[in-house]
Structures are given as structure tokens and as C-alpha cells.
Amino acid sequence: RPSPHLPETPGAGSRGRSRLRDRDHGHDHDRLRRGRTPVDETRGYRVPGDPREEDEGAPPNGNDALEHRLRQLLTKWEDDLQRLRDKLRLDLLSL
């Protein structure tokens, strides 16, 4: 005779979720846990002074000329925008 508290099928539990038969067979119990050694505990964190982390700067690949031209273009656009703002302000004051 089936227990009155258990559904007849695993999927007939509350809100359609499968019934967990054993606590070791629950959700995500098949994944292995991360180790508890000090190396494993700090894995994924940046260590200050680590030489692998220090040389992450921009690689010297000759993009200085491109960066200089882009900065000049940005300066020109900012100057043009300022001239347009000044002209707009004068036009609005003349109304």
C-alpha cells in the first residue's frame, strides 16, 4: 500500500518538481566540490605582486600614432561642438 504522503510518480510532487529520494542525489550533488587546500581556496583571486598579473598592461604594438590621430579628431570635434553651442546661445539671445 503506497504512503499517503508520497506522490505516485516522481513528477507529481508539489509545483511539478521531481521528488528528491535521497539527500545525496539532490540537485547539483553530482558536481565535485572545490578542494580545501590553501591553493584551491585562493584560486580565482588575483594575488598582488604576481608576475603573471603585472605584465597585463597595454602591449607596445605601435598603436601610438593611431591614438594620437584619434585624440586630435576628438579635440577637433570638441572645438566644433563648443563653437556650435556658442552660436546657438547667441542666436537664442537675439530672438
From Swiss-Prot:
Disordered: region residues: 1-66
Bias-annotated ranges (Basic and acidic residues): 19-44
Superkingdom of origin: Viruses
Keywords noted in UniProt: Early protein
Name of the protein in question: Probable protein E5B
Organism: Bos taurus papillomavirus 4
